[in-house]
Amino acid sequence: MHHMPRTTGMNVAVVGGGISGLAVAHHLRSRGTDAVLLESSARLGGAVGTHALAGYLVEQGPNSFLDREPATRALAAALNLEGRIRAADPAAKRRYVYTRGRLRSVPASPPAFLASDILPLGARLRVAGELFSRRAPEGVDESLAAFGRRHLGHRATQVLLDAVQTGIYAGDVEQLSVAATFPMLVKMEREHRSLILGAIRAQKAQRQAALPAGTAPKLSGALSTFDGGLQVLIDALAASLGDAAHVGARVEGLAREDGGWRLIIEEHGRRAELSVAQVVLAAPAHATAKLLRPLDDALAALVAGIAYAPIAVVHLGFDAGTLPAPDGFGFLVPAEEQRRMLGAIHASTTFPFRAEGGRVLYSCMVGGARQPGLVEQDEDALAALAREELKALAGVTARPSFTRVFRWPLGIPQYNLGHLERVAAIDAALQRLPGLHLIGNAYKGVGLNDCIRNAAQLADALVAGNTSHAP
């Protein structure tokens, strides 16, 4: 068996080449730490990937990020990508929810909300009564639905809160933990009792802390991507790693060795051993659990217990002139509507460069925790389903000239009730395995910004010699 000897100094093996693993490896190597990245598949990026097809620029997974995370902007700057960040078209600020038989605009302000038809009048007045909400008892892991009903009422929870979580988690509003999925809401309740009061006070504080004239905040807060899609970030990270990134390198086993770690690797039909001081497992939870099982069965069970919602992304492209460009970012469909689609992004409206020559591109989402079985259908069936739902929900009768389907059986980690307790237990169990670290979207944030921020923090901790960093 070929043996890769341990090099001098601290060295790290990063297992998994999604955005979390790539970012950790990049940060470590840019700080002078010898790090190698091992990815079992033939490409880097994990769920993140952009494809230029037939005049369309389609994302296979995540489609954008909010330009509000310093770690993401710092990573873009380090990779010389700041000039390639593109903000969404202003039209994308308008969003829609399918409720009571049609698409309805989500109001952008409290006065607009009270005057809108997004909810029946009684439900809108109930939301206004949120000013008199009571705090939850301390130490209760409350579902997003229970939190919403207490603050906003039943209708607003079933329509608005469910739609919001669907766009992020594609989850079950009755099962998701509010503290794990929307910690800012829990913080606002704790500090201000009322979410409305908290929002008003936050706006006031923001105005008082306004920057002096002539200066501008570095972070726009805008929905953003790169000029060639999110693949631009993946390609830049891959280029920064160079030969330190190995694709087709599957880690078959992991064992403790002389205060460090030994990895058994199969790469392009050859088996090899690699000895390192530290290991970062950045693979999805199920793959991480498989590697952990021989080391610590209890830890492996904790990690394996993280549920995922399957997702299918169905892109439908329409020739110029066959239908009007849709308004706004897109629409979401609450579970109570019992439709077969979670929602759709108006991709060519949000980022016009995603479709050439006046073409129109819809990116439809199917499955989630509410209908996981739909994702098991073949691509033709999923494309037909998306066409039918788009016609029923948005009135699109034109026939698409372009279709592309991406299926993710393990799509989005579900931060269900007990998730924070589970992550704390994982962290405690890792104390028994010094030099081993977990990272990825299964633990402390599912979004691109979360992954990049957590990767930077882990790299900082490793370089500083703090080996007890939480996942």
Curated annotation (Swiss-Prot):
Q: What are the protein's GO molecular function terms?
A: oxygen-dependent protoporphyrinogen oxidase activity
What broad class describes the main subcellular location of this protein?
Answer: cytoplasm
Q: Which cofactor does it need?
A: FAD
* Free-text comment on the cofactor: Binds 1 FAD per subunit.
**Which keywords label this protein?**
Cell membrane, Cytoplasm, FAD, Flavoprotein, Heme biosynthesis, Membrane, Oxidoreductase
Enumerate the residues binding FAD. 16-21, 39-40, 47, 61-64, 251, 408, 446-448
Write down the top EC class of this protein: oxidoreductase
Catalytic activity of the protein? protoporphyrinogen IX + 3 O2 = protoporphyrin IX + 3 H2O2
Can you list the disulfide-bonded cysteine pairs? none
Among InterPro entries, the record links this protein to: Amino_oxidase, FAD/NAD-bd_sf, Protoporphyrinogen_oxidase, Zeta_carotene_desat/Oxidored
Activity regulation note: Strongly inhibited by acifluorfen.
**Biological function:** Catalyzes the 6-electron oxidation of protoporphyrinogen-IX to form protoporphyrin-IX. Does not oxidize coproporphyrinogen III. Involved in the classical protoporphyrin-dependent (PPD) heme b biosynthesis.
Q: Which NCBIfam families match?
A: proto_IX_ox
| Complexes and interactors | Monomer. Homodimer.
| Protein known as | Protoporphyrinogen oxidase
